């Protein structure tokens, strides 16, 4: 059977959806009828994904990579995060499958007041975090173009469903709920099948 390798952080996991198998990776595996090798975990960073690659299969038909947000929240520079994402995607090339890389979403929908309140940041720190988020997402899009990877712009996909919206897609500030996971899985499916 064909293999789907999921790498990364809580964007992909089932835990916050309230439904067994509700995470984006689980939903995509079912939609595509692929065997899921799930190496995602809550709080994972790009450094963690590099380590996880040692457990990856030698081939995969589909790979999704959701990483960078926890690095960003941990104070890492976009340049350092992008360097590790470049290393990861380079190491994924021999697997031979279609790889989907993802931008980092913004649960505040661009509202710095929400970022300050929910993350306990000063105004200056919030502005700096947004600058770093924009730089990271721009770098992820560039990496996808340069490597010929599929790009899922999760920042755009999730915009309008932030914490203050009538239909928020997040719990515990940054974690995707079932609606978010479903939208992400559908977006990945569309990218992979169009």
Residue ranges and their predicted role:
Residues 1-42, 52-59:
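Serine-esterase "nucleophile elbow" of acetyl-processing enzymes
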Residues 3, 61-64, 98:
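Structural motif
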Residues 36-38, 49, 150, 166-194:
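Histidine-centered active-site loop/cap adjacent to the catalytic His
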Residues 38-40, 103, 153-156:
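Residue-level recognition of beta-strand->loop/alpha-helix junctions
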Residues 48-83, 106-109:
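Oxyanion-hole/transition-state-stabilizing segment in secreted/luminal serine hydrolases
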Residues 78, 82-86, 137, 178-189:
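Short, amphipathic alpha-helical "lid/cap" segments that border enzyme active or binding sites
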Residues 94-99, 149:
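A short helix->loop->beta-strand "cap" motif at the edges of active sites that frequently abuts
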Residues 111-152:
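Substrate-gating cap/lid alpha-helix
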């Amino acid at each position: 059977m064909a293999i789907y390798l999921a790498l990364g952080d809580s964007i992909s996991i089932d835990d916050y959806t309230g439904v067994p198998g509700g995470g984006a990776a689980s939903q995509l595996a079912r939609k595509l009828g692929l065997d899921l090798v799930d190496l995602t975990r809550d709080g994972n960073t790009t450094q963690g994904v590099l380590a996880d690659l040692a457990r990856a299969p030698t081939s995969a038909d589909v790979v999704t990579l959701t990483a960078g947000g926890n690095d960003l929240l941990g104070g890492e520079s976009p340049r350092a995060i992008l360097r590790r994402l470049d290393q990861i995607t380079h190491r994924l090339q021999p697997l031979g499958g279609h790889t989907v890389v993802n931008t980092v979403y913004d649960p505040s929908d661009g509202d710095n007041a929400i970022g300050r309140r929910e993350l306990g940041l000063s105004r200056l720190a919030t502005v700096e975090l947004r600058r770093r988020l924009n730089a990271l997402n721009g770098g992820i899009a560039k990496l996808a173009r340069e490597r010929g990877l599929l790009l899922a712009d999760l920042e755009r996909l999730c915009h309008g469903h932030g914490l203050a919206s009538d239909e928020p897609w997040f719990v515990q500030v940054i974690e995707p709920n079932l609606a978010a996971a479903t939208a992400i899985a559908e977006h990945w499916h569309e990218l992979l099948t169009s």
